[in-house]
């Protein structure tokens, strides 16, 4: 039986927790959605920079140390979070799929994905909530109508909380009407909007990266972005307090996936999917820390429950704020096609271990991707070709990919000692294989099947010569030759024409 947030508040009252008078009404719910942000905050044990606003928020509520996203890329993760369903259950697993146009270019016939379920904003709106999306990030891999999701959208899309800080997001809502909103913070995508503050020579470099100036620049810049993000979070909290909403708002702060560098964004290592989650709200006692496994689709269920209505039976997320909540014994994450790069990986995370199943071992992790033009990517390839990467770094940057990986996360947080072939861990390997097989069967993992010809063709139209995976060969002939030129492999020069 799934309890509502009101039952949760009643339970807390019985336990003696202090509740404000405003908590008797339906609480507001606000998602502080961080883009491309790794959890390098003080409250999560990082001492390199100071993040006072996020740290203060954590002290005011519950900090979740084992929060995992269902994907390491925005559109798949966000499609899951806004529905409470795994992206693989609703056919939203391929990054930026179901798009009728791309950067202003008409895609013609595309693989439309029409859902039979309602999104979280639609559910909340039907329950009487005023809904808004500050920042306008609507990166969903299914067909939807923004007007049905939100009462208010800012006229100008951006990566900061300016509209919310000005009070515009809730200014025109009904009197005493609760709101459900999302505020999108640019995080790792702030670019030059984040001042260069951090000393690059002092940043920590994980062992799976070569220690170079370019790598240090990438890491240092992300720290700069986190400093600016912390400022933005402070502005959001100040606006809630100024307008009298803070005491009756359930705040859920979390990130969609890790920062942009290799092994993090788009991948299922800890840097890609192990993200921050902080819950603050009426009736929630501050200063709590939990090691419970939480999936990003659980945010969806907790949000719906907060409105006082039952969580739909079809929803795969769990209301982790409910007093009868049963902790998960595992969480699942999935990697499928990202941009033009076709990949198929699944991850099972249990309290102690992580199991990775790499299905496409015919291609390395460093197969052609959108990151190839970056100077740091080109440096990685040069170092690899010159034999200047060590064994630890070659696990990811090498030309081979193991079909299975198993890591003891407590002893090996960087995931560099693969235990999959160690006889001592045969039992754990078998256990995690079974968990994955059962999950695939129960959820009907749509990523287990090849992408449709229409989906491949649409991707080929978008990216042209960058589509080098063999899966594209069966549809390549359907486009004019001028539209798809032979791709040049990264690091290889085109042969000179004979005179």
Region spans (language model):
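Active-site His/acidic residue clusters
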Residues: 167-219, 257-267, 280, 423, ...
């Amino acid at each position: 039986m799934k309890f509502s947030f009101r039952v949760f508040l009643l339970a807390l009252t019985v336990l003696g927790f202090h509740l404000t008078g405003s908590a008797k009404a339906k609480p507001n719910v606000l998602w502080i959605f961080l883009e491309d942000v790794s959890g390098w905050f003080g409250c999560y044990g990082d001492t390199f920079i100071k993040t006072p606003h996020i740290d203060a928020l954590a002290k005011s509520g519950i900090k979740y140390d084992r929060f995992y996203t269902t994907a390491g890329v925005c559109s798949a993760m966000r499609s899951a979070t806004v529905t409470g369903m795994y992206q693989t259950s609703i056919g939203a697993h391929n990054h930026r799929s179901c798009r009728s146009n791309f950067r202003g270019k008409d895609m013609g016939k595309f693989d439309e994905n029409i859902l039979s379920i309602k999104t979280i904003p639609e559910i909340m709106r039907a329950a009487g909530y005023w809904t808004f999306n500050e920042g306008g990030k609507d990166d969903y891999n299914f067909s939807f109508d923004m007007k049905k999701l939100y009462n208010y959208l800012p006229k100008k899309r951006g990566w900061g909380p300016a509209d919310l800080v000005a009070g515009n997001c809730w200014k025109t809502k009904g009197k005493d009407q609760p709101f459900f909103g999302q505020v999108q913070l640019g995080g790792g995508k702030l670019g030059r909007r984040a001042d260069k503050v951090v000393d690059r020579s002092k940043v920590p470099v994980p062992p799976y990266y070569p220690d170079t100036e370019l790598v240090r620049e990438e890491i240092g810049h992300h720290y700069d972005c986190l400093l600016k993000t912390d400022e933005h979070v402070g502005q959001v909290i100040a606006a809630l307090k100024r307008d009298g909403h803070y005491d009756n708002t359930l705040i859920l702060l979390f990130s969609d996936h890790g920062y942009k560098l290799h092994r993090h964004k788009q991948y299922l290592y800890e840097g890609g999917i192990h993200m921050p989650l902080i819950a603050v709200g009426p009736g929630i006692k501050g200063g709590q820390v939990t090691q419970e496994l939480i999936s990003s689709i659980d945010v969806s269920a907790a949000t719906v429950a907060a409105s006082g209505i039952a969580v739909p039976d079809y929803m795969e997320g769990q209301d982790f704020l409910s007093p009868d909540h049963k902790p998960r014994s595992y969480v699942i994450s999935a990697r499928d096609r990202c941009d033009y790069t076709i990949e198929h990986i699944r991850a099972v995370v249990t309290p102690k271990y992580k199991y990775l199943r790499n299905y496409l071992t015919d291609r390395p992790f460093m197969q052609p991707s959108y990151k190839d033009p970056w100077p740091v990517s080109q440096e990685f390839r040069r170092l690899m070709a010159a034999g200047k990467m060590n064994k630890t770094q070659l696990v990811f940057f090498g030309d081979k990919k193991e079909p299975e990986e198993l890591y003891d996360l407590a002893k090996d947080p960087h995931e560099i000692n693969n235990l999959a072939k160690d006889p001592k861990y045969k039992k754990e390997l078998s256990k995690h294989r079974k968990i994955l097989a059962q999950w695939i069967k129960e959820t009907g993992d749509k990523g287990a099947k090849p992408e449709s010809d229409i989906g491949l063709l649409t991707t080929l139209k978008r990216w042209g010569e960058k589509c080098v995976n063999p899966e594209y060969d069966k549809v390549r002939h359907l486009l004019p030759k001028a539209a798809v030129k032979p791709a040049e492999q990264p690091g290889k020069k085109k042969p000179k024409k004979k005179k």
